[in-house]
């Protein structure tokens, strides 16, 4: 296939390398000829590196470069061009102008594809004389390594184009998912679940960025915490995406932005690229502060209180602490000196203190969510005795013989604690994507694991917990906070009620009105 790529920036050169390596003839062009030269040099250096590392032969590298053709004029006639991929700056007027000029230069048989990450594919296509020829083809940077591509048909896109683009993408070694033309498409939309909830937790002073990041990594198993991720991406970029998707979905509560970001963006606290963000960077930046040492009395007796519905979590915590040698009291209530540990699921320690008459100074929350690493989370209320909290942290840090001690994060009491809130938001946003038929459930999980690097897809993650337990969590968060961002989605509610998995697309009305044959 002969492919013309318009735009020789980071994304355009990555797409060019990917397509040429897969055996396609690629015309690479830009209104700035120096950008094309730099892009070809970059691709050459990447291919040379691949040869040095033994991932490609010298002959294949040379053949790939021969298939990469620098083009001086983006609007040159191209009777043999079969596909155009536009990768210019993210501006509607610029993109429509590019396609308008290409429409005059290329044959009517050429398929047009835009690499837009945030603009409406339908609006870009609407400026063409033939809007049926255009679709979205959204790659992720760096293209050769990020092996997922979103195929986005516009409202007028010919039905044969998305399957053809899918076949092309998958023949070149990447995976393709078909996504509805909605704000943020799939991956950027799904990614809002983590960062918006992390910002909400920071607003509430539940923990600082380092606390929340540690919990995200060590409990949820994410490669990076949300604040580390925002610093890597750039807060200016992240905040703009959050605002754009929220506005695009008409201020949906689940996608609500934080008041924290505008001032930080204005102050230039963008992250790694400016040297300061949620963390400091550079040779003169101070080293990250270590976690406070564990200093309490690990032998102080504890009583594990199982609130209604949490008997299983309470029993599991008792068993784990007993195996670690902790002094775990039994009976109907705690002794006068015992710490009270309360496993919370979408609720607060404060509610347990009020509802069950627990000693406010000695009662603490423990997140029962199974940890990916060796970290536990202790929640403290405003009434907590600091000495008792230090002792509770020491007890939770205990480990069975031969095991590493647990790290213990101390956070402010909030509904569901940190990890539950983050996971509930991740699952809820993904469920909303499936519910709106923006993408199929399997594609949601595929795109999120490939595009965001999550250890498991969000819907499959919810299934690991159980649809009924996820619904219980969403309902408890909504009931406890009153915040509509935690309102259970129809997708989770129905599947919990019907005994279906969150990954199950279910039966649609269309399935019931036509024969399978």
Describe the function of each predicted region.
Residues 12-13:
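N-terminal Rossmann-fold NAD(P) dinucleotide-binding loop
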Residues 27:
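Conserved beta-strand positions in the Rossmann-like core of class I SAM-dependent methyltransferases
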Residues 97-146, 153-166, 338-391:
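Rossmann-fold NAD(P)-binding glycine/threonine-rich loop
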């Amino acid at each position: 296939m002969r492919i013309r790529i318009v735009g020789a920036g980071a994304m355009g050169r990555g797409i060019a390398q990917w397509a040429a390596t897969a055996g396609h003839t690629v015309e690479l062009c830009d209104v700035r000829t120096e950008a094309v030269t730099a892009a070809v040099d970059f691709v050459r250096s990447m291919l040379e590196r691949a040869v040095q590392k033994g991932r490609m032969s010298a002959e294949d590298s040379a053949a790939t470069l021969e298939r990469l053709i620098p083009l001086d004029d983006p609007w040159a006639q191209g009777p043999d061009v079969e596909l155009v991929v536009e990768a210019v700056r993210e501006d509607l007027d610029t993109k429509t102008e590019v396609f308008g000029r290409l429409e005059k230069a290329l044959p009517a048989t050429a398929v047009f594809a835009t690499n837009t990450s945030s603009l409406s594919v339908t609006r870009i296509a609407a400026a063409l004389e033939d809007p049926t020829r255009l679709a979205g083809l959204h790659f992720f940077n760096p293209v050769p390594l990020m092996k997922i591509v979103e195929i986005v048909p516009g409202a007028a896109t010919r039905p044969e184009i998305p399957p053809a683009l899918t076949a092309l993408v998958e023949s070149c070694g990447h995976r393709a998912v078909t996504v509805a033309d909605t704000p943020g498409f799939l991956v950027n939309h799904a990614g809002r679940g983590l960062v918006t909830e992390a910002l909400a937790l920071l607003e509430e002073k539940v923990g600082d960025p380092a606390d929340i990041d540690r919990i995200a990594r060590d409990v949820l198993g994410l490669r990076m915490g949300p604040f580390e991720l925002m610093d890597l991406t750039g807060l200016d970029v992240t905040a703009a995406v959050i605002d754009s998707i929220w506005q695009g979905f008409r201020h949906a509560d689940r996608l609500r932005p934080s008041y924290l970001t505008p001032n930080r963006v204005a102050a230039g606290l963008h992250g790694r690229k400016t040297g300061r963000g949620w963390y400091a960077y550079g040779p003169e930046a101070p080293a990250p502060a270590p976690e406070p040492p564990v200093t309490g009395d690990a032998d102080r007796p504890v009583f594990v209180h199982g609130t209604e519905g949490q008997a299983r979590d309470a029993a599991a915590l008792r068993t784990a602490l007993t195996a670690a040698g902790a002094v775990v009291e039994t009976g109907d209530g705690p002794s006068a000196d015992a710490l009270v540990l309360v496993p919370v699921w979408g609720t607060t320690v404060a509610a347990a203190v009020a509802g069950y008459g627990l000693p406010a100074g000695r009662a603490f929350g423990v997140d029962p969510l199974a940890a990916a690493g060796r970290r536990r989370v202790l929640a403290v209320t405003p009434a907590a005795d600091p000495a008792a909290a230090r002792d509770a942290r020491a007890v939770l840090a205990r480990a069975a013989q031969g095991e590493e001690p647990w790290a213990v994060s101390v956070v402010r009491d909030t509904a569901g604690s940190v990890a539950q809130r983050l996971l509930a938001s991740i699952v809820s946003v993904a469920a909303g994507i499936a519910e709106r038929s923006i993408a199929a459930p399997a594609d949601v999980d595929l795109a999120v694991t490939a595009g965001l690097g999550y250890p498991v897809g969000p819907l499959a993650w919810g299934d690991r917990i159980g649809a009924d337990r996820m619904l219980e969590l969403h309902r408890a968060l909504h009931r406890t906070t009153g915040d509509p961002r935690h309102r259970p989605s129809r997708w989770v509610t129905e599947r919990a009620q019907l005994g279906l998995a969150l990954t199950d697309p279910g039966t649609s009305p269309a399935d019931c009105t036509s024969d399978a044959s």
